[in-house]
Amino acid sequence: MRHAQVNRNTLETRINIKVNLDGSGKAVLATGVPFLDHMLDQVARHGMIDLEVSAEGDLHIDAHHTVEDIGITFGQAFTQAVGTKSGLRRYGHSYVPLDEALSRVVIDLSGRPGMEFNVEFVRARIGEFDVDLISEFFRGFVNHAMVTLHIDNLSGTNAHHQAETIFKAFGRALRMAVEADPRAAGAIPSTKGTL
């Protein structure tokens, strides 16, 4: 099984993440940020990834450090779980609609961190959650998972729907990228021979 556990402790946050890439979509989430729990549940369910996240952070200030550090720690756990990437598809993509909203996410397990985040949320907050933190979560993930990630919200008039389509599409793109390629026979999916 491809799984990992990472603990990350700083003066601002204490994060513990367990990930199983060959899971059934089970999530146990206690981030202290309810909207982030809801979004991570989408990643687990649609990515068929078992995901456990517990976090304590300086939420008396705001959720920035907690959300960003969860992204960082998830990226670290993902890197450990995915291993050498031999025999994997490497690339994943997904379009996900939710009513009027539509988002596209494309990922490359390239070994090179890079992100394009093209999302104009229709409002600045979803309940108490600052939508700016969504890009911070993904940036933390990208920089520590060493992946290239393109996120595009193509339509939407409801910020919750915009966010949910992004996280669902991210889960589905991850699932595709980490699947075994039956024709690859365990080879590294790169002409360089390494990722």
Swiss-Prot record:
Broad class of the protein's primary localization: cytoplasm
MF terms in GO: imidazoleglycerol-phosphate dehydratase activity
Gene Ontology cellular component terms for the protein in this record: cytoplasm
Keyword Membrane carried by entry: no
Pathway the protein takes part in: Amino-acid biosynthesis; L-histidine biosynthesis; L-histidine from 5-phospho-alpha-D-ribose 1-diphosphate: step 6/9
This enzyme's EC code(s): 4.2.1.19
Keyword Repeat: no
InterPro entries in the record: IGPD_sf, ImidazoleglycerolP_deHydtase, ImidazoleglycerP_deHydtase_CS, Ribosomal_Su5_D2-typ_SF
GO biological process: L-histidine biosynthetic process
Catalysed conversion reaction: D-erythro-1-(imidazol-4-yl)glycerol 3-phosphate = 3-(imidazol-4-yl)-2-oxopropyl phosphate + H2O
Keywords: Amino-acid biosynthesis, Cytoplasm, Histidine biosynthesis, Lyase
Family classification: Belongs to the imidazoleglycerol-phosphate dehydratase family.
Protein name as it appears in the record: Imidazoleglycerol-phosphate dehydratase
